[in-house]
Amino acid sequence: MIDETAYIHPSAIVEDGAVIGANVRIGPFCCIGSQVEIGEGTELKSHVVVNGITKIGRDNQIFQFASIGEMNQDLKYHGEPTRVEIGDRNRIRESVTIHRGTVQGGGVTKIGNDNLLMVNAHIAHDCIVGDRCVIANNGTLGGHVILGDYVIIGGMSAIHQFCQIGSHAMVGGCSGVVQDIPPYVIAQGNHATPFGTNVEGLKRRGFDKDSLNVIRNAYKILYRNGKTLEEAQQEIAELAENNQHVKIFSDFLANSTRGIVR
């Protein structure tokens, strides 16, 4: 079904069964599969391919040569009906690739709202990206990676499969991340190691001085006081009883499956 207010360039191919919302614009030489749904106000520039069971929300901008919903690169995948879900107001720049999920990983690759995926970024199968994240040019997420909200991934950085990166964390450019990065932390290098808290980013998002101080304190307990991970987790868990930001930090440590960058 194609809404009467949608614009589709004569050279674009939209297969029967696709759902195209109001005021959608589909540019030259785009290819849209039969199981695709594109929400109101979303714009596809030129040469965009959207395939598979893919749902794209409202007011997204998708630039030329992006590929969304294509078969993933997991060797165990044999064409099962998995999908991609993308929220609202995302900017997906040139040559970005977003692959569909796997049955083993829950069946869905999911992108939230208000994200910026820069040129050549790759989102592998079963990744979950929160809201207001930035993945810079040539950034790569391996399969099953989870990003919290407001995460920044520097250019040419790669995140290993199954890693989690907490909200408001930042990964510097040209980094290789093989373990989980807690919320609010800056990490860089190959393999990535912590370099402090993302103070400037937190200030921009309205964190007050008291909140910044308790986050710094939690960071020092984990990284600067010579404690074992178990000792640090216990002390941070006690502080978390009285502060929501420390609770987020503490819960992330407790739920880590790949270990924490140290």
UniProtKB/Swiss-Prot annotation:
Pathway the protein contributes to: Glycolipid biosynthesis; lipid IV(A) biosynthesis; lipid IV(A) from (3R)-3-hydroxytetradecanoyl-[acyl-carrier-protein] and UDP-N-acetyl-alpha-D-glucosamine: step 1/6
Keyword Cytoplasm among record annotations: yes
Enzyme Commission no: 2.3.1.129
Source taxon at top rank: Bacteria
CDD domains for this protein: LbH_UDP-GlcNAc_AT
Chain segments annotated as coiled-coil in the UniProt record: none
InterPro entries hit by this protein: Acetyltransf_C (IPR029098), Acetyltransf_C_sf (IPR037157), Hexapep (IPR001451), Hexapep_transf_CS (IPR018357), Lipid_A_LpxA (IPR010137), Trimer_LpxA-like_sf (IPR011004)
Reactions the enzyme catalyzes: a (3R)-hydroxyacyl-[ACP] + UDP-N-acetyl-alpha-D-glucosamine = a UDP-3-O-[(3R)-3-hydroxyacyl]-N-acetyl-alpha-D-glucosamine + holo-[ACP]
Any single biological process term in GO: lipid A biosynthetic process
Enzyme class, spelled out: transferase
Subcellular localization, as worded in the UniProt entry: Cytoplasm
Recorded GO CC terms: cytoplasm; membrane
Family: Belongs to the transferase hexapeptide repeat family. LpxA subfamily.
Described function: Involved in the biosynthesis of lipid A, a phosphorylated glycolipid that anchors the lipopolysaccharide to the outer membrane of the cell.
Protein name from the UniProt record: Acyl-[acyl-carrier-protein]--UDP-N-acetylglucosamine O-acyltransferase
Organism: Photorhabdus laumondii subsp. laumondii (strain DSM 15139 / CIP 105565 / TT01)
